[in-house]
């Protein structure tokens, strides 16, 4: 099976895509592999052979997915997903080594790091909001907690 050339695929996808979102005269794209979320040929994850996607999974964890050019004819198997569970610096270094080490476009590394930083900041805020504040319901022996006004049993 032969694959469609990237430029021809873009002609089909650019105006008609299930990932396309048009708001206030600007076209956005929610497709996997599109780091900038703009509907352009350069940032399209569907049309390019090598693409990077950094997103949250169902559990709220950050996952990096790399599109493998070897599996271009099998879209369901073309993404290699890697969870980014380490601290910020190690995960950023993993993103750099995966993109630069496998000869992805140079501009994708900076965009991937920017997206990872934004998602990392978002998850930290979400973790902070998820914690409930501890409230003390009452203490024994606190001031005003003696049994005034109660009849004595003795």
Please give the residue ranges for each predicted region.
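Compact, Lys/Arg-rich rRNA/RNP-binding cores from ribosome-related proteins
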Residues: 1-154
